[in-house]
Amino acid sequence: MASTRGYVNIKTFEQKLDGNKKIEGKEISVAFPLYSDVHKISGAHYQTFPSEKAAYSTVYEENQRTEWIAANEDLWKVTG
């Protein structure tokens, strides 16, 4: 079910941390009502832009709240 209120398209950038650790960059599109209800952006390196249709292949619709919460946390996952 495509959002009738548009999407927030999020592009995060790779962040190198101490040692060999990093946070991977990602591109996702989130239905606006879901994004406005649940999102974490503090201290992040990211950009967003609104659009009528999803801009990226990874898309979270309004009925995917649980999946979006997990993916939102994963945006800031440290690896390495």
Swiss-Prot record:
Main localization category: virion
UniProt cross-references to InterPro entries, sorted A to Z: Soc, Soc_sf
Pfam families, per database record: Soc (PF16855)
Record localization: Virion
Keywords noted in UniProt: Capsid decoration protein, Capsid protein, Virion
One GO cellular component, as annotated: viral capsid, decoration
Subunit structure: Homotrimer. Interacts with the major capsid protein; three soc molecules associate with each interface between the major capsid protein facets.
The protein's role, per its UniProt record: Capsid decoration protein which helps to stabilize the capsid against extremes of pH and temperature. Once maturation and expansion of the capsid has occured, trimers of soc attach the interfaces between the hexamer of the major capsid protein. Acts as a 'glue' between neighboring hexameric capsomers. Dispensable for the head morphogenesis and phage infection.
Family recorded in the similarity comment: Belongs to the Tevenvirinae Soc family.
Protein name as annotated: Small outer capsid protein
Taxonomic source organism: Enterobacteria phage T4
Organismal lineage: Viruses, Duplodnaviria, Heunggongvirae, Uroviricota, Caudoviricetes
